[in-house]
Amino acid sequence: MGINNINKIPVRNNKISFVAVHLIKALTSKKQEKLVKLQRKKKIISVIKTWSRSSTIVPLMIGEIIAVHNGREHIPVYITEEMVGFKLGEFATTRIWRGHLKKTTHKKNNKTYGLYF
């Protein structure tokens, strides 16, 4: 390789990424191959449910739909190439933003109270 080709070399991270064992089994099992054949015939979408938000997205997961638990429900996440290296939990938010409090003044003593809506 010459100096001109240095920019084309992919940079690899030496850290070991965690992936839950049940996710690897679900992605590589023979059942998955059978489901792929059924998907082509009947247009069935297979979703893999997981509670493992700390699992890293690996290239094996590209094109799959993984339902990530956010504490209340499973959020379906379609895995793309740009997501590789991130954690599954980053794509299923756990908190709901309800905005800032609305402040009102009462006529009796002119104090300001925060009201929750």
Swiss-Prot record:
It is found in: Plastid. Keywords: Plastid, Ribonucleoprotein, Ribosomal protein, RNA-binding, rRNA-binding. GO terms for cellular component: mitochondrial small ribosomal subunit; plastid. It comes from the Eukaryota. One of its GO terms (biological process) is translation. InterPro entries: Ribosomal_uS19, Ribosomal_uS19_bac-type, Ribosomal_uS19_CS, Ribosomal_uS19_SF. Its main location: plastid. SUPFAM superfamilies: Ribosomal protein S19. One of its GO terms (molecular function) is rRNA binding. Protein S19 forms a complex with S13 that binds strongly to the 16S ribosomal RNA. PANTHER family: RIBOSOMAL PROTEIN S19P FAMILY MEMBER, SMALL RIBOSOMAL SUBUNIT PROTEIN US19M. Belongs to the universal ribosomal protein uS19 family. This is Small ribosomal subunit protein uS19c. The lineage of its organism: Eukaryota, Viridiplantae, Chlorophyta, core chlorophytes, Trebouxiophyceae. The gene is rps19.
